[in-house]
Regions:
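Catalytic adenosine-cofactor/nucleotide-binding cores of aminoacyl-tRNA synthetases and other
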Residues: 1-134, 209-238
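Basic, alpha-helical terminal appendages of large translation-related enzymes
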Residues: 104, 111-238
């Protein structure tokens, strides 16, 4: 596990290989083992999303690398010299946040949101992403949802979040993620967080997602939907 102790299911201090394969692909596990395949590894649930996102990053880089660099890319070895050719649409961490925000019980619901932001893609053409939607739901239900701690904002924090809603109501659904991110920054600065914007985003994450960290909010709002994000915030500050 994360402390280097033998995994004990009864103690709940790690995950088994079988559990890993419920939450992520065999290729992600192979990547995790890749640096030192014979060495005992710390196997715990928190490392799964990070490893999956690293795997996706390597897949994304591979097509544009020089031949000499391709053979040093771990996915070249993981896939026996033939990595899949798939455009990476979003990180696994974003999918996890989407599962929580949308209350998705199945991948059809997730694909509905994916297609809102990427209208032209189909699950049949994106097998990696399609499988990731299943993994994300499994991981969220088992490892994320039981540990969520939603913050109840005080009056000052509620006012800041209400001002965020007012600003979101003025923007267009087609606004770019970077523009939305700037708007969220501005609201934070105007509501007492100018010297510590990290605390502003921490407030948003804890209230909306029940976690101290989360996705880049401009991208999330664009992806999840402006109206849906406003509704989500409203339900958390009532």
């Amino acid at each position: 596990d994360e402390k280097g102790e033998k995994i004990s299911k009864s103690k709940g201090n790690g995950i088994s290989i079988e559990q890993w394969l419920r939450y992520a692909s065999p290729e992600s596990l192979a990547l995790y083992m890749y640096p030192n395949p014979k060495r005992a590894k710390k196997l715990y649930s928190e490392v799964v999303p990070k490893t999956v996102d690293e795997y996706l990053s390597f897949i994304e880089k591979y097509p544009n690398q020089k031949p000499s660099d391709k053979i040093t890319n771990p996915v070249w070895h993981v896939h026996n010299g033939k990595p899949p050719k798939e455009k990476i649409v979003m990180p696994f961490s974003m999918l996890l946040n989407l599962v929580g925000s949308s209350n998705a019980e199945n991948k059809k619901v997730l694909w509905k949101f994916i297609n809102r932001f990427h209208k032209d893609i189909k699950s049949i053409d994106h097998p990696i992403l399609d499988k990731l939607t299943e993994y994300a739901i499994n991981y969220f239900k088992d490892k994320v949802e039981p540990n969520k701690k939603f913050k109840i904002p005080d009056d000052k924090e509620k006012l800041a979040l209400k001002n965020l809603i007012k600003s979101l109501e003025k923007i267009n659904q087609v606004d770019k993620p970077e523009e939305i991110q700037t708007i969220i920054y501005t609201v934070g600065k105007e509501n007492g967080y100018s010297s510590n914007l990290r605390e502003w985003f921490k407030l948003i994450y804890e209230v909306i997602f029940g976690e101290q960290d989360g996705p880049r909010m401009g991208f999330f709002v664009s992806f999840f939907g402006v109206k849906e994000t406003i509704s989500l915030i409203n339900t958390k500050i009532k």
